[in-house]
């Protein structure tokens, strides 16, 4: 009888204790690759083998080529060559993105929906799987240069504080059904490869002045009965150091931002469903800005990104861009406060989705200098993240200069 009671007790513990308490059995030890300094696939295989020996079991690799990204040296772009015009001066760019390189845009896999730079993905999958490494394709949505260049009419509309007018923006209008169909077609073709998953690029957001296309405003009016009029959204707009700021967002703005966050999640779901028509087992990860976890109200205002909305959709992983140096620069906090913030962020998102669905992304390159971050600093960041909970980790962006010995040690810990 005592043995029977013990068994029942154990079963109850297994099935009814909160999932977040338990460390997951198969942690993701990932690295994210923006560019590989390899001239051919033999060198690629050697590089991937080094990652394997460092304890890496998941490779997240860029499969898009935006206009100012660097080409993979082992790829063979079609002739005639793409434009080689230099990139424009940096204005901060997309946060965390390493810029530089030749012009031209497209993708690195076969599809009839986008220009193909070279079909290298199949070979990369083969090499990764031969080394027992899973591979996630890292792919864009709104910031897809190839579609923007082909269809300027697909550009979104934004509110220009300087002129007080709605003008054309720089990213795709996801409220245009044609844009969604093109993206769904690309992702379906991407899903035909033997990849293990897809990471959405961090462009699936709408900033506080974005989303004012005719289609978006019409849908918002239909869904809420409210007009998406910029004049009713912002109060006390002011200029400082050449930039415009908002002192106060109105109640209409918050309804607008909440609605935009739902539309973004709906767009992601449409794309995921299209890809899973081809491969039902395909995993999806969504990039989360650090504010989405640390300051949800700000993230909703600035990015229309809402973790509570996103967890209602079928994402397998939530990839938190916990880029400590970027956070320090933007927030003006001390190292100590940033480290404590990383622990709090980890603990906070564990409470929402559990440990196994979280991928905490650690910055290993300084975005401004392009230099590798010192080993002791990487270790300190990882230590404080792990204090928040036993979560999956990814180091971003890994290059030939990244200290793989340190990464191996951190994965083993």
Model-derived segments and spans:
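Aromatic-lined carbohydrate-binding/catalytic grooves of carbohydrate-active enzymes
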Residues: 56-83, 103-117
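Glycine-biased, low-complexity coil/linker segments
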Residues: 91-96, 100-103
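Aromatic-lined carbohydrate-recognition surfaces of secreted/lumenal glycan-active proteins
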Residues: 136-141, 199-206, 238-239, 249-303, ...
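Substrate-binding cleft of secreted/luminal carbohydrate-active enzymes
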Residues: 307-413
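Active-site-adjacent "subsite" loops/lids of carbohydrate-active enzymes
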Residues: 26-28, 136-193, 250-253
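Glycine-rich, aromatic-flanked loop segments that form ligand/cofactor-binding clefts
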Residues: 58-61, 120-165, 199-205, 281-283
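Catalytic domains of carbohydrate-active enzymes, especially glycoside hydrolases
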Residues: 44-69, 193-197, 310-318, 387-388
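Aromatic- and acidic-residue-enriched segments that line the glycan-binding/catalytic groove
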Residues: 72-80, 105, 144-166, 202-243
